[in-house]
């Protein structure tokens, strides 16, 4: 980090390291992507606080540590194709875009999808495609993915989503009740077998099937 970095950004990086984030590529990317571009204007001064924040459509931008942790758990490589379910502000997609080949991110709210697309284009994240759609029902032509990240809580991970994983692919998702504590789960595909590992407790907004009729 440059010695002239604002104190809040220096504390931001220190917090991530203290909480166990060690992947240098992830840390560098978290430093480079300006979180203030993804929060509401009234929250820009608090953009580097390690907490989730409200955005439009009753959704949230995730806590920076959780973004970094989930990204680290994906074990991304530069040639990977990544699917994100739940674009939200676009912040997670911006982080992913710097660590893989391309990202397809799916959002059910048109307002969020349009704003995220604008932000990502502004930051030259041209390897990200923002799709207005239903993360539970991807079109057949969407194809397979090396990594899948879900940023809203599911009661269970649908097999149709697991089947989108390439061999040796990894999926990470919060699983549990819609209103309460969920468990972050990492699933690794080996052939037709799926190994599941529970990681940490988290709180996410619920994943809802379908495309929002309003907003």
Curated annotation (Swiss-Prot):
GO terms for biological process: methylation; protein modification process; protein repair. InterPro entries: PCMT, SAM-dependent_MTases_sf. It comes from the Bacteria. One of its GO terms (molecular function) is protein-L-isoaspartate (D-aspartate) O-methyltransferase activity. CDD domains: AdoMet_MTases. One of its GO terms (cellular component) is cytoplasm. Pfam families: PCMT (PF01135). It is found in: Cytoplasm. Gene3D superfamilies: Vaccinia Virus protein VP39 (3.40.50.150). Catalyzes the methyl esterification of L-isoaspartyl residues in peptides and proteins that result from spontaneous decomposition of normal L-aspartyl and L-asparaginyl residues. It plays a role in the repair and/or degradation of damaged proteins. This is Protein-L-isoaspartate O-methyltransferase. The lineage of its organism: Bacteria, Pseudomonadati, Pseudomonadota, Alphaproteobacteria, Hyphomicrobiales.
């Amino acid at each position: 980090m440059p010695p002239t970095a604002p104190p809040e950004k220096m504390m931001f990086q220190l917090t991530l390291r203290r909480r166990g984030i060690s992947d240098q590529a992830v840390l560098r990317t978290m430093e480079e992507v300006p979180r203030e571009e993804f929060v509401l204007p009234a929250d820009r001064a608090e953009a580097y606080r390690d907490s989730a924040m409200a955005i439009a459509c009753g959704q949230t931008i995730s806590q920076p540590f959780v973004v970094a942790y989930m990204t680290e758990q994906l074990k991304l490589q530069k040639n990977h194709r990544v699917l994100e379910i739940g674009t939200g502000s676009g912040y997670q997609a911006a982080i992913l875009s710097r660590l893989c080949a391309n990202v397809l991110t799916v959002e059910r709210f048109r307002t969020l999808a349009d704003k995220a697309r604008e932000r990502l284009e502004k930051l030259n994240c041209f390897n990200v495609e923002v799709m207005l759609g239903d993360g539970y029902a991807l079109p057949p032509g969407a194809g397979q993915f090396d990594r899948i990240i879900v940023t809203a809580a599911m009661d269970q991970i649908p097999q149709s989503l697991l089947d989108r994983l390439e061999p040796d692919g990894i999926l990470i998702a919060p699983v549990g009740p819609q209103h309460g504590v969920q468990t972050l789960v990492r699933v690794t595909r080996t052939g037709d077998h799926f190994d599941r590992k529970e990681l940490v407790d988290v709180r996410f907004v619920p994943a809802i099937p379908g495309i929002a009729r309003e907003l």
